[in-house]
Regions:
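The feature captures the beta-strand-to-loop junction immediately N-terminal to the Walker
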Residues: 36-38
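Helix-to-loop junction immediately C-terminal to a conserved catalytic motif
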Residues: 51
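Conserved ABC transporter NBD signature motif
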Residues: 59-66, 79
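Conserved ABC ATPase "signature" region
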Residues: 113-138, 183-186
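Conserved catalytic motifs of ABC-family nucleotide-binding domains
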Residues: 163
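Catalytic Walker B motif of ABC-type/P-loop ATPase nucleotide-binding domains
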Residues: 167-171
């Protein structure tokens, strides 16, 4: 089976602190893989390197066979490789559906333009994904009024809005109550 992600001998330091040293791993298409380690062991740094947030010091990162280690975040995202964050990145003053619409990859445009011509299918897709993560009943609520766990579910739905080929989840269950966690895992 072909690997969707290949990380080869990747290292990243901040000043004198070595966050990642010669990390190598590959992930097959369609697999769910867990990266486990204590706090401060470099998991988030590796995620940031894979999606282009941190340039690597050496090594190689290939996504679908294409070297991506020199590419900027938006280009890597357009290739279908996305991540969520330990801290949620939502628009607190906007409702859940609007958050979903903004996250759609066509949203490099101004907000006014985004909201002035939303295809019905896009709104339906947003509502279906909100239903998938259990937030359909709260779709008209301001995102800032959701619990932390619900905000993480919203962020997951926002990432899925772009149908990524690969989604890196950074601490997806931190701060979420166990009932919601079981919903995510299902």
């Amino acid at each position: 089976k072909m690997s969707i992600l290949e990380v080869n001998n990747v290292s990243k330091s901040f000043g004198g602190v070595k966050a990642n040293v010669d990390i190598s791993m590959s992930v097959e298409k369609g697999k769910i893989v867990g990266l486990i380690g204590p706090n401060g062991s470099g998991k988030t740094t590796l995620f940031n390197s894979i999606v282009g947030t941190y340039p690597i010091d050496n090594g190689s990162i290939k996504f679908n066979g294409k070297e991506v280690s020199e590419l900027p975040v938006p280009v890597i995202a357009k290739l279908g490789l996305l991540r969520t964050f330990q801290q949620t990145r939502i628009y607190g003053k906007l409702n859940c559906v609007d958050n979903m619409l903004i996250s759609h990859k066509g949203s490099d445009e101004s907000l006014f333009k985004i909201f002035s011509k939303i295809p019905k299918e896009l709104t339906e897709k947003a509502e279906n994904l909100l239903n998938f993560v259990g937030l359909y009943q709260k779709r008209k609520l301001r995102a800032g009024d959701l619990s932390f766990g619900q905000q993480k579910l919203l962020e997951l739905a926002m990432a899925l809005m772009n149908e990524p080929e690969m989604l890196l989840l950074d601490e997806p269950t931190a701060g979420i109550n166990p009932t919601l966690i079981n919903g995510i895992i299902d």
